[in-house]
Amino acid sequence: MMDSSEHDYYEYFDEFRGILLYKQFIKYWDNVEAFQARPDDLVIAAYPKSGTTWISEVVCMIYAEGDVKKCRQDAIFNRVPFLECRNDKMMNGVKQLEEMNSPRIIKTHLPPRLLPASFWEKRCKMICICRNAKDVAVSYYYFFLMVANHPDPGSFPEFVEKFMQGQVPYGSWYDHVKSWWEKSTDPRILFIFYEDMKEDIRKEVLKLIHFLGRKPSEELVDKIIKHTSFQEMKNNPSTNYTMLPEEIMNQKVSPFMRKGISGDWKNHFTVALNESFDKHYQQQMKGSTLQLRTEI
């Protein structure tokens, strides 16, 4: 039997096709599954808290050919709709996307096997951004604290245990990143590391420009780097999620743009927690060629 705190924890989530997912998303799943992709759609896929907003803004700037004003006209969650996001009140990713002109940029946290079939049929390009598990766990913990429809995550070590067992929305980080990594041999899929973007943003921006078939210029790259720096995005209402009401995202508890660094896990993991995490990590990632850096 579940104790009351465990019952509270699962109030908003349910097991769905092998992962934990928000009940509201599951309720409207048929609309996601039936979604019709267009050949020029671009999918940005990532496990939550891996740098999705950052790479989305970089891509928006590439599409806008460096026009900052154009990118500031609307919130990132309207420019890059969140495919499977749906609730009874105000959010409907599928509807947003259906009403959008091409080319569309589409955000998802789904693993490849749950992505609507039409994306594969239409041979859409996809960008997957991946971040080291420890920093993701830290960021996810703070996300739980500040976003509505999330239970109390408990203490940080308690939350990390849930994270390790895949008992968080979108399930196991390990399964998620391994499944996208296996897909990345496909030339239509670009796999990008958060840590590489932190270390050499110019190199990664150029990689993205080439992947998207655009012409690079020094001026364009400079504009993108400036506009998508952490400080710029933290202060930009169109990227920092302050356009969402406080009852959805309470940034007084923790800002959406919190630190934007690699290695913040060192400020949260005790030696013992780190040791057990590393042991579990090695078991989960055994046999995978995917290598991530926990610091730069």
Swiss-Prot record:
An example molecular function term from Gene Ontology annotations:
estrone sulfotransferase activity
PTM (free text) = The N-terminus is blocked.
Q: Does the keyword Transferase apply?
A: yes
- Which InterPro entries does this one have? P-loop_NTPase, Sulfotransferase_dom
Instruction: Please provide the record's keywords in A-Z order.
Output: Cytoplasm, Lipid metabolism, Lipid-binding, Steroid-binding, Transferase
- Subcellular locations according to the entry: Cytoplasm, Cytosol
GO biological processes: 3'-phosphoadenosine 5'-phosphosulfate metabolic process; estrogen catabolic process; estrogen metabolic process; ethanol catabolic process; positive regulation of fat cell differentiation; sulfation
Provide the Gene Ontology terms for cellular component: cytosol; nuclear membrane
Activity regulation description: Inhibited by estradiol.
Mutating residue 264 to A: effect?
A: Decreased of sulfotransferase activity
Task: Provide the residue positions that the database annotates as binding substrate.
Answer: 107-109
Keyword check for Lipid metabolism: yes
Catalysed reactions, as listed in the record:
estrone + 3'-phosphoadenylyl sulfate = estrone 3-sulfate + adenosine 3',5'-bisphosphate + H(+); (24S)-hydroxycholesterol + 3'-phosphoadenylyl sulfate = (24S)-hydroxycholesterol 3-sulfate + adenosine 3',5'-bisphosphate + H(+); 17beta-estradiol + 3'-phosphoadenylyl sulfate = 17beta-estradiol 3-sulfate + adenosine 3',5'-bisphosphate + H(+); 3beta-hydroxyandrost-5-en-17-one + 3'-phosphoadenylyl sulfate = dehydroepiandrosterone 3-sulfate + adenosine 3',5'-bisphosphate + H(+)
Which Pfam family, any one, appears in the UniProt record? Answer: Sulfotransfer_1
Where does the record place the catalytic residues? 109
Q: Tissue range of expression?
A: Adrenal gland and much less in liver. Detectable only during pregnancy in uterine.
**Which residues are 3'-phosphoadenylyl sulfate-binding?**
49-54, 131, 139, 194, 228-233, 258-260
For this protein, the Enzyme Commission number is 2.8.2.4
- Give the matching Gene3D superfamilies: P-loop containing nucleotide triphosphate hydrolases
Give the superkingdom in one word: Eukaryota
Query: What's the effect of swapping residue 266 to A?
Result: Loss of sulfotransferase activity. Does not bind PAPS
The family assignment reads: Belongs to the sulfotransferase 1 family.
Query: What's the subunit arrangement here?
Result: Homodimer.
Q: What does this protein do?
A: Sulfotransferase that utilizes 3'-phospho-5'-adenylyl sulfate (PAPS) as sulfonate donor to catalyze the sulfate conjugation of estradiol and estrone. Is a key enzyme in estrogen homeostasis, the sulfation of estrogens leads to their inactivation. Also sulfates dehydroepiandrosterone (DHEA), pregnenolone, (24S)-hydroxycholesteroland xenobiotic compounds like ethinylestradiol, equalenin, diethyl stilbesterol and 1-naphthol at significantly lower efficiency. Does not sulfonate cortisol, testosterone and dopamine. May play a role in gut microbiota-host metabolic interaction.
In Swiss-Prot or TrEMBL terms, this protein is called Sulfotransferase 1E1
- Record the organism: Cavia porcellus
